[in-house]
Amino acid sequence: MTDTAEHFRIETDADNIAWLHFDKSDAGTNVLSQAVLEQLDLHLQQIAAQCPRGLVILSDKSNGFIAGADISSFTKLKTSAEVMGLLETGQTVFNRLEAMPFPTVAMIHGFCLGGGMELALACRYRVTRDDPGTRLGLPEVRLGIHPGWGGSARMVPLIGSIKAMDLILSGRSVDGRTGKRMGLVDRVVPERHLRSTARSMV
């Protein structure tokens, strides 16, 4: 069974696992805008109502998982209320994802940065492709901003304050194997095992 929408596609397989495919329309890279977040929230509510065995979030873009927030949309924010609205939307969506009553897995390849990393941290588990091109991090400081969707708060208890602050304050990214050693991700596997591993985690 499939359900298509502008940026997302839900696939529920024979084992009642929901696969949420992210493929931002008219874009070469997955980024998170206000509209994308609102659509994601609706899909999460729909999936929660279906009570699947688990949820796997993955990207249909060949170049990576999610690059982060849609930076181009920042210039359209004219008031502090609009800024707060974007922050609150992201926090609401990721809190909903974190509170899902079944296992959730971020299936990561390529870049998983900024808001993409924050989304992955809101999942119960994270599995990455074993590839030097896999990059995990919160580079917001390099833009003069701070992670605003709960990523820093979720990262600290996961990997400890020292390692988390190093990543957050430097803005540097790490590959999957380094992320596994730090405790940032749970599994690092070859591409051919990525989907089966994600399935096994739910």
Residue spans for each PLM region:
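Hydrophobic/aromatic residues within transmembrane alpha-helices
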Residues: 57, 70, 119-120, 179
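Amphipathic alpha-helical segments at domain termini/boundaries
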Residues: 1-23, 169-202
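CoA-thioester-processing core
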Residues: 113-168, 182, 198
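A structural preference for short, pocket-lining loop segments at secondary-structure junctions
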Residues: 15-23, 35-78, 92-109, 129-134
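Glycine-rich phosphate-binding loop at the start of an alpha helix
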Residues: 68, 84, 91, 114, ...
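A short acidic, glycine-rich active-site loop
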Residues: 78-88
